[in-house]
């Protein structure tokens, strides 16, 4: 594998000196989500209590209060302003009492730190001002880890500010896109599909691995600096895992996920790691040093929760997996029924975090979110329905 650009499989950890100025906090007051994750290696019958929940993209366009902020500021302007980002991050907690606050940011912020202008266009998505067709294009970007991390200071400031505003009430989630998902966005070249990304992989296999290695080192350092800023839990989003075959996924994603996870765990062993792999599966995920596996509604229906628990020998927490489209419907009672059906499919409720199968949609109804939460709150996670 090529190691040009000075990147290889060795650790290259950079911690911002400014991190030492952050206030250090202890364990959050509401630690139900952390206690569930800590139950990963315990017997399945251990009683935890309520089922914890949070919602992917829980601070977003479905919230009226967020849309008021958006009248004044763009998405990127909010991300770049630690005070605004913190304010938006807390909105869902104030409204719904979520068991974890997600810092308001985006997986593509890394590209901005690498020297790419990024904008989000409604109904289109992210637009990058630079296109990557070959290695020469990539080498023009800023790939120096120290510079990239320092350029993302506002993410780390926002995490620490949010922790203070919350009085350390609940855990904070930091996150990153997987190296593979970042690669696909980087080489998508603003097209609707990922044909350019796949073409790049087939045409420039060695260069693909070089780029993935660079992105892995940036991801590792971004996660470690989020943890040092106050994140209790981190999630890795492999949101584009479904665009490649099982074997390609193993080569171009799992290898780099393992690298990121192992190095983060080695350097910050107390952090909990959630992995979200969208609609792809390879049995080698069982060898990843993760605490939580976040699944989609499709994965829950196709494989069942028992399959995933058994794959990890019951030493895993499952997260998910309501279809986000259910929160668009006009009947709260139906939302509750679908949520109950989902909960019935989770065999070990004391090894479970309730969530959606993917990010909440912009047109989701607030009442439906309440119905989703109320249904979850009505179920205890004491005993499995069946031994999986």
Model-derived regions, located:
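Glycine-rich, proline-tolerant flexible connector loops at the mouths of alpha/beta enzymes
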Residues: 102-122, 128-132, 138-148, 230-250, ...
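Catalytic-face loop-and-helix region of soluble metabolic enzyme cores
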Residues: 262-386
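Conserved, mostly hydrophobic/aromatic
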Residues: 52, 93, 162, 219, ...
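Alpha-helix-loop-beta-strand connector modules within alpha/beta enzyme cores
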Residues: 151-170, 246-271, 312-315, 372-381
């Amino acid at each position: 594998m090529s190691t040009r650009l000075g990147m290889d499989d060795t650790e290259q950890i950079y911690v911002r000196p400014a991190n030492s100025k952050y206030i250090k906090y202890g364990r959050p007051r509401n630690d139900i989500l952390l206690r569930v994750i800590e139950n990963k290696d315990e017997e399945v019958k251990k009683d935890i209590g309520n089922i914890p929940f949070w919602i992917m993209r829980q601070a977003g366009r479905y919230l009226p209060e967020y849309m008021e902020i958006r009248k004044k500021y763009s998405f990127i302007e909010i991300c770049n302003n630690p005070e605004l980002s913190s304010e938006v991050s807390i909105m869902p907690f104030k409204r719904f009492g979520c068991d974890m606050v997600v810092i308001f940011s985006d997986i593509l912020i890394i590209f901005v730190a690498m020297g790419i202008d990024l904008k989000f266009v409604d109904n289109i998505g992210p637009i990058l001002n630079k296109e990557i067709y070959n290695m020469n294009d990539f080498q023009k970007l800023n790939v120096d880890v120290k510079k990239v991390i320092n350029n993302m200071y506002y993410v780390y400031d926002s995490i620490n500010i949010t922790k203070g505003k919350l009085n350390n009430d609940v855990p904070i989630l930091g996150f990153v896109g997987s190296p593979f998902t970042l690669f696909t966005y980087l080489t998508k070249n603003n097209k609707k599909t990922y044909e350019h990304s796949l073409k790049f992989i087939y045409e420039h296999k060695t260069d693909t691995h070089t780029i993935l290695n660079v992105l892995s080192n940036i991801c590792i350092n971004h996660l470690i600096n989020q943890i040092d800023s106050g994140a209790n839990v981190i999630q890795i989003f492999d949101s584009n895992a479904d665009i490649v075959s099982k074997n390609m996924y193993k080569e171009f994603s799992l290898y780099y996920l393992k690298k990121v996870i192992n190095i983060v765990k080695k350097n910050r062993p107390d952090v909990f790691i959630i992995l979200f792999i969208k609609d792809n599966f390879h049995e080698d995920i069982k060898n990843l040093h993760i605490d939580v596996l976040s699944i989609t509604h499709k994965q829950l229906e196709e494989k069942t929760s028992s399959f995933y628990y058994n794959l990890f020998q019951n030493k895993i927490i499952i997260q998910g997996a309501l279809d986000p489209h259910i929160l668009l419907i006009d009947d709260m009672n139906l939302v509750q029924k679908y949520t109950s059906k989902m909960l019935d499919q989770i065999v070990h409720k004391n090894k479970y975090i309730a969530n959606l199968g993917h990010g909440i949609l912009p047109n989701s109804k607030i009442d439906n979110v309440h119905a989703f939460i109320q249904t979850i709150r009505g179920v205890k996670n004491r005993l499995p329905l069946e031994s999986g």
